[in-house]
Every structure is written in C-alpha cells, then in structure tokens.
C-alpha cells in the first residue's frame, strides 16, 4: 500500500453524545493512528456534547465553528440492582469511569484536573466557542 501523502485524519463532529465505552474504543484507535505518525484533526461543525466533546478535545488540532457548543460532564450512571454488592461494584466502576474522563480532558485541554472537577460539580457545563478557545478545548474558531 502506498504511503499517505498527507497523513491526517479529519473528523467532523456534530454529536449529542453517545456511549462512553464505545468512545474509549475509538480513542484507542486514534492512539494507534497517532503512534504511526498520523495526525488527528477534529472539527466541531455543530454541537459536541458529552462523548462528542471528549472526541473533539482529543484531536492534535481542533477547530470549532463560531456557532458551535460543547457540553462537558462526567456521564450518567444508574440502573437497578438486586443486591448491595452489585450497587457497590457499579459505583466503583463509575468512579473509575469518571476519573478517566477527567484525565482525558486534563491531558488534552488547558484545564487542570482539580479546576475541571470544580467546574463540573453541578454536573453539566455548556461552553461556547470562545470559552472553548480560552480553556484550550479548541485551537481555532472558524
């Protein structure tokens, strides 16, 4: 197979979110691409909510349209359990999951983990393009 002349993956995002476990799988694929010298550019052309926001922040170069918004939050948790041990195990898994999300944002933005925890204490944080630029969630407003 011929080598790519421009080793860049462009991902255009207009997403209300999705399953975090599927997102983590996609981020792992992007890590493999990055390890092969392929750059990942993300472009928010609508909204980047929840998992879409994490994907957008993961790019090596990140753009947003001036009308775009991000929604940052730590995810949703909850289900019916029949035993206390099941509930306890699910809570432990959710804490690991939330910490993984915090780590991804803190590694790929200008927001330190402690500051992000404070910003998300009320669960959901909506940010417009200017705010995303300020916090290093995007690199450029288009």
Question: Which role does the model predict for each range below?
Answer:
Residues 9, 79-142:
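Charged, glycine-interspersed solvent-exposed loop segments at helix/strand-loop junctions
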Residues 19, 23, 49, 91-98:
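Solvent-exposed, acidic/flexible segments
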Residues 1-7:
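A short, well-ordered alpha-helical element
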Residues 6, 59-60, 138:
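Short, well-ordered alpha-helix to beta-strand connector turns
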Residues 17, 25, 33-79, 120, ...:
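Glycine-rich beta-to-alpha active-site loop
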Residues 8-32:
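Extended, non-globular alpha-helical segments
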